[in-house]
Swiss-Prot record:
This is GTPase Der. GTPase that plays an essential role in the late steps of ribosome biogenesis. GTP 1 binds at residues 9-16, 56-60, 118-121. The keyword GTP-binding applies. The lineage of its organism: Bacteria, Pseudomonadati, Pseudomonadota, Gammaproteobacteria, Alteromonadales. It comes from the Bacteria. It comes from Shewanella sediminis (strain HAW-EB3). Keywords: GTP-binding, Nucleotide-binding, Repeat, Ribosome biogenesis.
Amino acid sequence: MIPVVALVGRPNVGKSTLFNRLTRTRDALVADFPGLTRDRKYGRAFLSGYEFIVVDTGGIDGTEEGIETHMAEQSLAAIEEADVVLFLTDARAGLTAADQAICEHLRRREKTTFVVANKVDGIDADSACAEFWALGLGEVYQMAAAQGRGVTNMIEYALAPYAEALGLNRDGDEDEDEEEREYSEEEAEAEQKRLQDLPIKMAIIGKPNVGKSTLTNRILGEERVVVYDSPGTTRDSIYIPMERDGREYVMIDTAGVRRRSKVHETVEKFSVIKTLKAVEDCNVVLLIIDAREGIAEQDLGLLGFALNAGRALVIAVNKWDGIDQDIKDRVKSELDRRLGFIDFARIHFISALHGTGVGHLFESVQEAYDSATRRVSTSMLTRIMQMAQDDHQPPLVNGRRVKLKYAHAGGYNPPIVVVHGNQVKKLPDSYKRFMMNYYRRSLKVMGTPIQIRFQDSANPFEGMNTKKLTVSQERRRKRMMTHIKDKK
C-alpha cells in the first residue's frame, strides 16, 4: 500500500512550498481535492525512487483553543492516517509556543515524526536549529524547501526504514533502469505469467450514494456491504476476495468522495485518503457515475487521480433504469463531450439495484487488465515505430532531423513503451501525443492508458580516453597524408 506523508506545522513555515516541490506543482491549490477540508491538500509524489501521497494539513495557529479545534478537527485524523509525519518549523523565527503546543499533540499520537527546520538558506543553520532539539523528538533536519536543498535527503531518510514493509525501492536509479530496460523473451513471459496468475484488484470508486456498495452486493449476490440511502454509509475501504468464471478477483469497495462543503464529520473527511490509497493499490478502477446527476467535478477529480496513477479504467453509469429517453440522450452527449480524452475506456450503462448490465462489466475489466499486462515483443514495437515515422516524420531540432532507432517494452500495468533515438527528448509534445495514439491504435489497447518514454541513445565514444599522438606518430601521420595527396 502506498504510504502517506503528512506535513504538519504552524502557518508560514513552508508547508505549501514543500508540498508543491514534492508534487511538482506550481500552486498547491491544484491539488485541493474535492472531499477534503478547506485547509487540507493532497498530492501524489515520486521522489528518489519513493512513491507516496503527501498531505498538507493546513496551518495551526498555536493558541490553546486553536490547537484543540483545528488539530482535533483537521489534523489529528490525517496524522492517524499517515505513515510518516514531517513537523515543519521556521529556522529563521526560531522555536515558538505554537511549535511546542503542536509537539505535545504529536508526542501523544506516538507517530513516527521528523522535525524539519525549514528556511535555513542564508543563515547559520546549525546555530538557528539548535533550539529545536528541545522539542525532544529526535534529530532536527535542515531544509530550504524553496530552493530544494535537503528535500531529497529528508524524504530518503524518512521513508528508508519502511521501504521493505511498504514495498518501496530504495534506489530510484535502479528502479528507473529496471523499468526502462529491454526484457528478454524469457523474462517478459515470466513477468506476464506472474501478473496473470495474481488476482485482479478492482477498486470501485465514486461519489457517495452512487451505488458502489449496491453494485458490490449485486456482484457478490449477498448483503456483504452495508447499504443505506444516505451518503457516506461506507467509511472505510473494504477488500473482498471473490472468483468469477475461474478468475480470482479482489473487489475494493471504497468510501465516497464529496464536495468539501458537504463534508462535516471528521471520520468522513479523511476516508478519502483510504480511497486514494485503494486506487494506488488496485489494478483496475471501476468509476461509478450517477446518471441522474451527470458528471460532477468530484468524478473528474477521481478520474484524474486514477489516470495519473496509470490504472486501467472502466466507467459504469449507474441508475440508468427509470429515467426518460431525453435524459439518457443528454447524459450520453455530456459523456462524449467531457470524457472525450479517455476514449480508450469502456462505458457501461447499468442498474446496480436490478442487475441490468452488471454482468458485462467483468468482460471490460478483464479486457482492461489483459491490455495493461499484455506482452509485446521488441520487434513489433520497433516495427510500429518505423510505420509511425513513415506516416509522419519527426520534426527538425536545431536544424537536424530527430531519428528514432528502436523501441522496447519498459513495463506493465500500465504498458510502457521506451523509444530510443537521437535528440528524442527534444521532441515537441504534439509529436509525442502522435506516437502515443499511433501505438494505441496499432496495438488495439483498450481500457488502459499507455505511456511512451523517450530515451536518448548513448554515444559509444563518449568518455573514451583518446590519447594524444606522440611526436613520432604525428610525423608518420604527416608522411602518410603527404603520400595520399601526391597520389591524387
